[in-house]
């Protein structure tokens, strides 16, 4: 088994060394090594919370508040995280001029924290480190949003 994994690593290294351009497609697996739970596996986020559909989220201030509260709770449970080996590899490929871009399902912003520019990152499900106001479009960092929710609850 280990020799098979080593063979795959060697093949990947060969492909990367020969490549002119690399596109990274990533999902939950790249961030689970960092301590971030995935959403769908047993014990994942959706086993604890029923997903909020987009229509409900957009039409109900209470649903938006609930969704943000859930997200903040998950963030606090996970705690601070650092980019993992996959994020670091993508950043190295960027610095080497080989990375065409990253397309990710993740919302954790770890590709950017590792050194991949936002301009080279497509986040299919958005970014969980900030949000835009639905009324004015202004960007707010998640810590600011958390403060607003806490102030509202007092």
Residue positions per predicted region:
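Conserved catalytic core of sirtuin-type NAD+-dependent deacylases
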Residues: 1-154
């Amino acid at each position: 088994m280990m020799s098979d994994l080593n063979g795959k690593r060697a093949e990947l290294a060969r492909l990367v060394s020969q490549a002119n351009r690399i596109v990274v497609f990533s999902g939950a697996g790249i961030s689970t090594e960092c301590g971030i739970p995935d959403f769908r596996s047993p014990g994942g986020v959706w086993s604890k919370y029923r997903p909020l559909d987009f229509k409900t989220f957009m039409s109900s201030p209470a649903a938006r508040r609930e969704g943000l509260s859930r997200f903040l709770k998950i963030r606090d449970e996970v705690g601070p995280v650092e980019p993992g080996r996959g994020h670091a590899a993508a950043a190295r490929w960027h610095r080497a001029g080989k990375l065409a871009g990253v397309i990710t399902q993740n919302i954790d912003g770890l590709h950017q924290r590792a050194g991949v520019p936002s301009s080279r990152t497509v986040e299919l499900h958005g970014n969980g480190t900030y949000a835009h106001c639905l009324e004015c479009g202004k960007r707010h960092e998640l810590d600011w949003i958390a403060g607003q929710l806490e102030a509202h609850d007092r």
